[in-house]
UniProtKB/Swiss-Prot annotation:
This protein's record includes keyword DNA damage: no
GO biological process annotation, one example: isopentenyl diphosphate biosynthetic process, methylerythritol 4-phosphate pathway
Stated name of the protein: 4-diphosphocytidyl-2-C-methyl-D-erythritol kinase
Class of this enzyme: transferase
Record EC number: 2.7.1.148
Length: 289
């Protein structure tokens, strides 16, 4: 039996770090929303008791480093599943980009295998399992738009922001999330107003959203990788309504309301950056139907 599952990327409209926890993680407060840039996974049930990862993308690991592999392994161990699965990952989301591509693949694997193996788990139970794999996996199980707290695994759903274009630009560099958090000095950064962002999203205020975007990690990544700051400057210069780095980077996104301006920004960035995408805010929550 085969099953096809979609794994959408996310962006952070607001990201704040409140402090370091005793378990080594950081306490965060952030707003994430899904976009219609997505990986596609094909799950094929195997009679043999093994997990196989296949992908044409050479940057996708085919072993336990892969979060989709970890998701399948977790379900097999928790629920004593003796069957195996082959997971083919068609990557569209850039790897190590601050867009939760790996986490979304893991979330899609949890949702898909819940059906394929008839486990009968609720979406809340899947999200709880997702937290054992990675901080963003719980959100990716649900999708939509949400406030994430704790280390990112506590999810509270809010309204979907008004529909708009999202221009993404990723420079040809990798950013270590651990290094970014390691260099973060909480008393020397500007903290975004996450609560205000919740208010303007819930009231459908597009201009308010554009005025309130913020990411406490931006200046840290900019200091480590000045080319990320240059992309942000270019996107602003081309006329995006709001520009922000997603996650710990290096991807920068711009919000754009008008089609003509979207095309102008997209074409301008194509001459400046190798990986550029024009997508829409998705905002739809996943279901198990």
């Amino acid at each position: 039996m085969k099953l096809l599952v979609k794994a959408p990327a996310k962006i952070n409209l607001s990201l704040d770090v409140l402090g370091k926890r005793q378990d080594g993680y950081h306490e965060v407060k952030m707003i994430m929303t899904t976009i219609d840039l997505a990986d596609r996974l094909e799950l094929t049930e195997l009679a043999e008791d093994r997990i196989e990862i296949l992908s044409h993308n050479r940057y996708v690991p085919d072993d336990q480093r892969n979060l989709a592999y970890q998701a399948a392994k977790l379900l097999k161990e928790k629920f004593n599943v003796k069957k195996g699965v082959s997971i083919t990952i068609e990557k569209t989301i850039p790897v190590a980009a601050g867009l939760a591509g790996g986490s979304s693949d893991a979330a899609a694997t949890l949702r898909g295998l819940n059906k394929l193996w008839n486990l009968g788990l609720t979406i809340d139970e899947l999200a709880e399992l997702g937290a054992e794999i990675g901080s963003d996996v719980s959100f990716c199980v649900y999708g939509g738009t949400a406030i994430a707290t704790g280390r990112g695994e506590k999810i509270e759903h809010i309204k979907t922001p008004p529909s708009c274009w999202v221009i993404l630009a990723k420079p040809h560099i990798g950013v270590s999330t651990a290094d970014v958090y390691g260099n973060l000095k909480l008393n020397r950064v500007t903290h975004p107003n996450v609560d205000k962002m919740v208010d303007v999203i819930n009231s459908g205020d597009y201009k308010g959203i554009c005025d309130t975007v913020g990411n406490v990690l931006e200046d840290v990544t900019f200091g480590m990788h000045p080319e990320v700051a240059r992309i942000k400057s270019q996107m602003k210069r081309f006329g995006a309504d709001a520009v922000l780095m997603s996650g710990s980077g290096p991807t920068v996104f711009g919000l754009v309301h008008h089609d003509s301006r979207m095309h102008r920004i997209y074409n301008g960035l194509k001459g400046f950056c190798e990986q550029v995408y024009a997508v829409r805010l998705l905002g739809e929550r996943e279901t198990l139907e």
